[in-house]
């Protein structure tokens, strides 16, 4: 019949196939197509899973680094300051006894100081502005006698918060964060080169160079004698 295409199975049967494989031709082609599509989907899913895993790992690493930086910053903030004499570097006190800082007088107030701070028992009246009636005792470094500031012994009512506090001049002290030093003892096998060791190494290299030159000269003489003997024979 015109316009009608004869359908045949794998055995050559026509559309009205009576063999047992009826419909298996089309089923096998559909199955292959579905398997191909499933394979493509599986590959795509694997690709997405790989990308998601990579992104998750990167995010996890970034979170860990951020947390580590935050911990280090918090630890740095919690480390106390140690105040040193600017003349001899003796420790005078630390920020654990910190009370306040005064920008107008350029000093800091501490509740207590170390034994390196000497107190002059001779009392005198303060000559600073807004400190009328304050009785002071001079503070000096026990090591180098540098004037460090004052301790308030008597104060008017409006300055009672300064009484028995140690006022250290910022110009007379230095400070560093406790635990901030990164210097470590270097073992003998990792000791850094200094000037003396460099001189010794250069001396040894010069001696080795002289020995090599002497050996080269002897080798040249031996080759010359051998060449002369060969020519003579």
Swiss-Prot record:
Residues 80-178 form the Mis18 domain. It comes from Homo sapiens. Zn(2+) binds at residues 85, 88, 141, 144. The modification Phosphoserine is found at residues 36, 39-40, 233. The keyword Transmembrane does not apply. Detected in testis. The keyword Nucleus applies. Required for recruitment of CENPA to centromeres and normal chromosome segregation during mitosis. Belongs to the mis18 family. PROSITE patterns: MIS18. Changing residue 176 to D: Abolishes interaction with OIP5. Homodimer, and heterodimer with OIP5/MIS18B. Identified in a complex containing MIS18A, OIP5/MIS18B, MIS18BP1, RBBP7 and RBBP4. One of its GO terms (cellular component) is cytosol. GO terms for biological process: cell division; CENP-A containing chromatin assembly; chromosome segregation; pericentric heterochromatin organization; protein localization to chromosome, centromeric region. This is Protein Mis18-alpha. It is found in: Nucleus; Chromosome; Chromosome, Centromere. Keywords: Cell cycle, Cell division, Centromere, Chromosome, Isopeptide bond, Metal-binding, Mitosis, Nucleus, Phosphoprotein, Ubl conjugation, Zinc. GO terms for molecular function: identical protein binding; metal ion binding; protein-macromolecule adaptor activity. There is a cross-link at residue 162 (Glycyl lysine isopeptide (Lys-Gly) (interchain with G-Cter in SUMO2)). Changing residue 85 to A: Abolishes location at the centromere.
